[in-house]
C-alpha cells in the first residue's frame, strides 16, 4: 500500500501539477471545485481499499490542482509551488546524505531531547543555520516568500495582510526614495523585495544562511530588483558594516534568534546613522506567561524547537534591551491585541481556507503524506519526515500560545538612535 501511494502520488502529482493548471480556465475551475472537493475528501478518508484509491485518484489530483491554482489566483505567490521544488530544496546546503544527522544534532539542542538554553545560546549560529537549511523549503512551499505572521482585518486574505504588515513597517520608518536600508535576518527576501518596491529604497538583506541567500538572489533577479537590493552573509551579532552606514534598519521576526538581545540591538545601533530609526516585529512571551506553569513551559518549548530559537524573551525584556543598547523608544505595541482576525488562524486546524489551503489541517495532512512518499522513493533525503514533524509541533505550540495569549509574534517597536550616540 505504501509503495502504491508513493508511486501514484509522486508520479501523478509531478506530471499533472502544471499541465492541469495551464489547461483549466477559471470558469471550469469554479464549475468543478465543489464536486472535486467532495471526492478529494472522500479519498483522504478512504485509502484503506486499493480499488477506492484507483477509482478516485484522478479526482483527488484534480482537486489538488484546483486548490493550488486558486492559491495562485488569490495572489499567494508561492514561489516554489511544486512537489519537485519542495523535494529539491529539502536540506538546503546540507549534503542529502547528511540531512538525517543534521536533524539529530538540531533536535538535541532542545529541552525535550536533553538540551538546554545555555547550550542553544552558545551554539546559536550552528543551531539556527541547521534549522533554516532544514525548513526553508517547507516554509516556501507552505507560506510563500515572506516568512512571517500579520494581524488581519476581516475579509482580508493572508497574503494581503502580510503585504500590509510590511508596508506598515516602511511607513513607520518614514522611508524615502534612494535611502539605504538594512533588513536584519532577511530570510529569502520576501519583505526586502516588497519594501524596496513600495518605498523605492535600496535594501541590503543580512543573513547567515547560505541557502536562503542563494534563493533570495534568484528571486531578486526574477522580479528585477537585483541592481538595487543585495544580500550579505554575516552574523547579526557581528555585522561587517562601518559605523553609521544605514538610513533605516528593520527586522521582521528575526532577531528572536539572537542569543543576546542587547548585543544584537547594539550592533544595529552601531550601523544606523544618528537620528535615524530601527523598527521591528519581535517574537515574545507576553506578561500572561507564567514560567512556573508546566503547560506554558511546554508551549514555549514547542515553539523553540519548531522555530530554531535559543529562548523566547518577554516583551518587557526586549524593551529594556533597546534602552540598554542606546535607543530612544518612540512607540511599542503588541499588534496581536485587538486584531479582528487572530494571527495564528492559518495554522489552526479548525480553520479551512482555499486561498491558504496548504496551511490547513487537510493541506498539512497531504504535505505529510507527500513528504513520506518523496522520502520513500528517494527524491527527498532521509530525515525530511522528522523535519515536517517538528514543524507540526511548532504549529501546535504557536496556536496554543496565541489562544492563551502567552505568546506573540507581533510585538512592534519603533526606536531612534539619538543624534549624539555617545552612551
Report residues per predicted region.
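Class I SAM-dependent methyltransferase SAM/SAH-binding core
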Residues: 180-182, 192-238
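A short glycine-rich, Lys/Arg-flanked "PGG" loop and its adjoining helix->strand segment in the class I
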Residues: 262-277
